[in-house]
Design a protein with these regions (language model features):
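N-terminal beta1-alpha1 cap of cysteine-dependent amidohydrolase-like domains
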Residues: 1-86, 91-95, 219-284
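Pocket-forming structural segment of enzyme catalytic cores
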Residues: 8, 115-208
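Cysteine-nucleophile active-site neighborhood
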Residues: 71-138
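Active-site phosphate/pyrophosphate- and oxyanion-stabilizing loops and adjacent acidic/basic residues
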Residues: 27, 31, 107, 158-159
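Short glycine-/acidic-enriched loop or helix-start segments at secondary-structure transitions
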Residues: 15-16, 54, 77-78, 110-112, ...
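A glycine-centered loop/beta-turn motif at secondary-structure junctions
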Residues: 176-218, 222-224, 228-236, 240, ...
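A structural signal for short, well-ordered beta-strand segments and their strand-loop junctions
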Residues: 5, 42-44, 100-102, 172, ...
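Short, glycine/charged-enriched secondary-structure capping and boundary segments
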Residues: 18-21, 80-83, 113-117, 168-169, ...
Length: 284
């Protein structure tokens, strides 16, 4: 199989993430995809960069899947970076290549297909999205195959989908963010996406908490930087020892987050239930 990872991070955010966790969002995706699909050929591009060469429709048809990463990019702002990312997604839809996105990746697909994204205001999901529940349509959708009736997932975002495009299917919600998972069809393309982050490790969750410490204080989710650091240290410790029941209990987490095979379930489902059947239809 041949995969293309499209990094939604602008250059400054990409380097800031590398400083805190050692890799960009696209590099995280590459590592996870190599584990989920050993032997797959994976390329990475950076559509937000002004100097980036964006593949056209025909070039995109040579891939079996396209993955869009998370990012602090605000899709509700008219910026050159946002326009480049949305233009890239238009090409993905036109190519008919199956696509998947997490966090900003979902928001990019939504806007490109005619939906809307907005800032969350004072609400936040920082660290983990709690009590995610599939909709009636979501319970039968292969993206969420194997997920329990209610589950948690890594999540870090300050924007959300305000309105899905026409014809999209809402698959999961919680009390903080209505659109947590969705299927979007546009032109020849099919996109499956989630607002949370099935691709990131607990170590990356801890790093994200540290990067967003000031924002957490501003919105009353922590009283001090020391509070944020204490939480990040617990998450780091659980990453190092995922079988520690005491840390999982203190953080209110179960195996849906602590076990990598469960945490990455949506990515695995996308490859098994959409990418491989589409590849077979194309005679590859």
């Amino acid at each position: 199989m041949r995969f293309l990872v499209a990094e939604c991070e602008p250059p400054q955010a990409r380097e800031k993430r590398r400083e805190s966790v050692g890799r960009s969002s696209g590099e995280t995706y590459l590592e996870v995809l190599h584990k989920l699909a050993p032997g797959a050929e994976c390329d990475r591009i950076k559509p937000t960069d002004s100097c980036a060469e964006i593949p056209g429709r025909e070039a995109l048809t040579e891939y079996d899947a396209v993955f869009l990463t998370g990012s602090p990019l605000h899709l509700w702002q008219d910026s050159p970076e946002a326009r480049r990312q949305i233009d890239f997604m238009h090409r993905v839809f036109a190519s008919g290549t199956p696509s998947f996105g997490s966090c900003a990746g979902l928001q990019v697909a939504c806007v490109a297909a005619g939906g809307k994204v907005r800032p969350m205001g004072d609400r936040r999901e920082a660290g983990f999205a709690r009590r995610l529940v599939a909709t009636e349509r979501g319970r039968a959708h292969p993206l969420l195959d194997g997920r329990p009736a209610s589950y948690d997932a890594p999540a870090i975002h300050t924007d959300e989908v305000e309105a899905l495009p026409e014809g999209a299917t809402l698959l999961a919600s919680n009390r903080v963010t209505r659109v947590q998972a969705a299927e979007i069809r546009c032109g020849e393309g099919v996109f499956w996406g989630v607002q949370y982050h099935p691709e990131i490790s607990l170590r990356e969750v801890a790093a994200a908490l540290r990067r967003q410490s000031d924002d957490l204080l501003e919105h009353g989710l922590a009283r001090s930087n020391a509070d944020v650091e204490q939480l990040a240290q617990q998450v780091d410790a659980l990453h190092a020892e995922p079988n520690r029941a005491d840390l999982a209990w203190q953080l209110g987490l179960d195996d849906q987050v602590t076990v990598p095979e469960y945490r990455t379930r949506e990515l695995r489902n996308f490859i098994e239930h959409l990418v491989k059947p589409t590849r077979a239809k194309r005679g590859r």
